[in-house]
């Protein structure tokens, strides 16, 4: 189950395990987390995170749901295996982040993959006629390579989403924007190194986080 009560306490535990948008269903988890906001029987929330990330939009939806809970209850995050990219994005909504020393965190960045099947389609003799209303309407089309202007547009989108990610980390971790950009190389790091960078509060296991909250 993605949600449970910790032992006999009034602490809810939400398991964010898997890819956000795949194993972690956005609408299901958002509804589940939102339901905790006004639940008087629940006094705190722990996010049990083991996720490499996933959908940027999905991460933002869940992040906002967690923030609504955090407005009235303590929210802690515990990274057991990996809390990278969108997984770390969610952790930043918590007031405190715990992680196993060997857990992987970070991967602060954005990636977009655009398949290009132009050569394959030519090889098998398939061609496309494209009718469109604007210059960039088919800029995601897999049947051709992007133009220089389209590549600039794509990079602009990536940069904008990345700026938002940096702002979330800077705000959630009380770090300077410039410092976050220095560590936001897209790489993962151990929680030990993350603690040295201010991306993790405490090294420990789930029991440590539970006792603290």
Describe these PLM feature segments:
Residues 120, 168-169, 183, 193, ...:
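Residues within well-ordered alpha helices
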Residues 74, 175-182:
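A local structural motif
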Residues 87, 187-192:
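Acidic, divalent-metal-coordinating active-site segment for phosphoryl/phosphodiester hydrolysis
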Residues 76-84, 183-187:
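Glycine-rich beta-to-alpha transition loops that act as phosphate-gripper elements at the mouths
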Residues 95-96, 156, 182, 186, ...:
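Well-ordered beta-strand positions
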């Amino acid at each position: 189950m993605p949600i449970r009560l910790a032992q006999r306490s009034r602490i809810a535990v939400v398991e964010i395990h898997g890819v956000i948008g795949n194993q972690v269903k956005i609408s299901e988890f958002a509804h589940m987390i939102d339901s905790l906001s006004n639940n008087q029987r629940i006094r705190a929330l722990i996010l049990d995170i083991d996720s490499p990330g996933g959908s940027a939009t999905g991460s933002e939806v869940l992040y906002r749901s967690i923030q609504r809970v955090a407005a009235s209850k303590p929210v802690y995050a515990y990274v057991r295996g990996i809390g990278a990219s969108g997984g770390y994005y969610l952790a930043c909504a918590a007031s405190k982040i715990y992680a196993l020393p060997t857990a992987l965190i970070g991967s602060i960045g954005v990636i977009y993959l655009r398949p290009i099947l132009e050569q394959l389609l030519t090889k098998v003799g398939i061609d496309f006629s494209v009718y469109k209303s604007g210059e960039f309407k088919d800029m995601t089309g897999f049947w051709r390579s992007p133009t220089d202007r389209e590549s600039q547009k794509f990079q602009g989108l990536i940069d904008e989403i990345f700026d938002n990610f940096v702002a979330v980390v800077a705000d959630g971790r009380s770090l300077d924007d410039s410092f976050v950009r220095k560590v936001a190389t897209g790489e993962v790091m151990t929680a030990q190194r993350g603690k040295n960078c201010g991306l993790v509060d405490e090294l420990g296991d789930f029991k440590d986080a539970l006792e603290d909250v």
